[in-house]
């Protein structure tokens, strides 16, 4: 589980991550995104999305189911089809006392192709940082910062349990 504090409101970050149609606008690896089913009402429900990605010489497509729960500030993504044998990720957004957000992000994946798996394993940490960085940069464009730049959120870390990494 990657855990970080971002100086944006949890509702704004939930909105950003749930806005999958705009991923190609700010995540350079995603070249296209198409929502094939949308059963979301008032931030609750699920949608299916087909993504096209490109990294160096690799071009792939995959489909995921995105489950949104705005009241809980939770997003879960599960794999439907494509080059993986598994893909899942979770986002949890926790409000801190100054209005900023403690973000918990967890991802698990495995490619069917062992060469692709080996390539991604070598850069796993870098890939996660890239993804988080893309969302953080887009949040900076869309939303104004909240909270204190030097907030000590040590106590909040004790109060907010780390989500389990099992799917």
Task: Please report, for each region that a protein language model flagged, where it lies by residue.
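Hydrophobic-ligand binding "helix-grip"
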Residues: 24-25, 32, 37-39, 52-102, ...
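Terminal "cap-and-tail" regions of soluble proteins that handle hydrophobic small molecules
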Residues: 3-6, 95-167
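Hydrophobic pocket/interface hotspot
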Residues: 13-17, 23, 49, 66, ...
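Short, well-structured hydrophobic secondary-structure segments
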Residues: 45-51
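Generic recognition of short, well-ordered alpha-helical segments
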Residues: 18, 88, 118-119
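Alpha-helix boundary/capping detector
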Residues: 30, 39-43, 75, 92, ...
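Hydrophobic ligand-binding cavity/cleft-lining segments
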Residues: 1-44, 98, 145, 156-167
């Amino acid at each position: 589980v990657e855990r970080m504090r971002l100086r944006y409101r949890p509702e704004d970050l939930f909105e950003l991550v749930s806005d999958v149609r705009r991923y190609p606008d700010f995540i350079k690896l995603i070249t296209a995104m198409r929502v094939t089913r949308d059963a979301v009402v008032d931030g609750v429900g699920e949608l299916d999305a087909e993504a096209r990605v490109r990294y160096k010489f690799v071009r792939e497509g995959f489909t995921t189911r995105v489950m949104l729960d705005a009241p809980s500030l939770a997003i879960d993504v599960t794999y439907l089809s494509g080059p993986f044998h598994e893909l899942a990720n979770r986002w949890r957004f926790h409000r801190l006392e100054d209005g900023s957000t403690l973000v918990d992000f967890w991802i698990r994946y495995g490619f069917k192709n062992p060469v692709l798996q080996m390539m991604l394993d070598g850069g796993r940490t870098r890939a996660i940082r890239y993804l988080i960085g893309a969302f953080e940069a887009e949040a900076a464009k869309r939303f104004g910062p909240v909270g204190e730049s030097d907030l000590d959120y040590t106590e909040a870390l004790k109060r907010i349990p780390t989500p389990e990494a099992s799917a």
